[in-house]
A protein has these predicted regions:
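Divalent cation-coordinating acidic motifs and surrounding scaffolds
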Residues: 1-252, 283-285
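Surface-exposed interaction regions enriched in Ser/Thr/Asp/Glu
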Residues: 250-285
């Protein structure tokens, strides 16, 4: 189910979104038992099982038990391989698939590793995390980020994966039952949620060919359907000032990211052919 849906629903939605994406698979493609091998083949993966397909697909091969994925991610040997293909300003999305709980790593330890440990600079800050954690675990029903952690497990799971649930709730991720016999809807929901989250954030360039960027003159322009009459979203000081359409910087003095206000985000994500442009204003050379 996981292999089929990574190559099917997930890959199709991500590719159709026209996002500048990268997928990193942390799993073993070389198990002696074929049923346990995780091979992601074309169009997303490479023609040879377990190989990279730059610039969009990378596989870090390691046997993962049902309980140790967080600990192994934090292991220097494997994290360095993962980090080599991460981009500092890009939004990250984790998808955990297991019927067990994390041992010994807690959600708080994993989050601290990402924000202030070896992952610092790649996953955001405690004030604004640059990642979301989706969980396909032992919960008995699909759960939204706003719903509390459940202790009721689905039929074939060892437990409900409480640590993974904590990470999903913390970051606004989805939780789905690993016991489902068909993951199509699960990966469809997760892929769409990733596209929507990324669509509402734009990375700022370090410089402009036209000169020094004047951040007070930057405009965010939305074109309905990709060809309609453009609308310019106004700049607001911060998220709290979002009362209608608009956008704000993560750091007004030296922005690295532009985030759309909720109203504008909804407008853009509801438009399958939306075009959003960052128009730079310059001080001159």
């Amino acid at each position: 189910q996981v292999k089929a849906n990574v190559n099917g629903n997930f890959a199709n939605i991500i590719q159709a979104s026209k996002l500048d994406y990268r997928v990193i698979m942390f799993a073993n493609s070389a198990y002696s038992t074929a049923a346990r091998q995780v091979c992601v083949l074309p169009p997303l993966g490479a023609a040879t099982c377990g190989q990279n397909k730059p610039p969009t697909f990378f596989q870090v091969n390691r046997s993962i038990e049902s309980w140790d994925s967080l600990s192994l991610f934090m292991n220097t040997t494997y994290y360095n391989q993962i980090k080599a293909n991460l981009r500092p300003g890009a939004f990250k999305a984790f998808i955990e698939v297991t019927d067990d709980q994390s041992n010994p790593t807690t959600a708080a330890q994993f989050d601290a590793f990402l924000l202030s440990g070896a992952g610092a600079g790649y996953f955001g800050t405690a004030a604004k995390r640059g990642y979301v954690f989706h969980s396909i675990v032992g919960v008995n029903t699909p759960l939204l980020p706003t719903q509390p952690k459940t202790n009721t497990k689905c039929s074939s799971a060892v437990n409900t994966g409480p640590q993974y649930q904590d990470l999903s709730i913390l970051t606004g991720g989805l939780r789905h039952p690993v016991c489902d016999t068909n993951y199509s809807a699960v990966f469809n929901n997760i892929a769409n949620s990733i596209v929507k989250a990324v669509a509402c954030e734009l990375l700022t360039p370090a410089q402009s060919d036209a000169g020094v960027i004047d951040w007070t003159k930057v405009q965010v322009q939305y074109t309905p359907g990709g060809t309609g009459t453009p609308t310019t979203f106004p700049q607001v000081p911060n998220a709290a000032a979002c009362t209608g359409n608009g956008y704000y910087y993560d750091n007004p003095a030296n922005p690295t990211k532009v985030t759309l206000c909720p109203n504008s985000c909804t407008t853009v994500t509801n438009d399958a052919s939306a075009k959003v442009d960052l128009l730079l204003g310059c001080l001159g050379s």
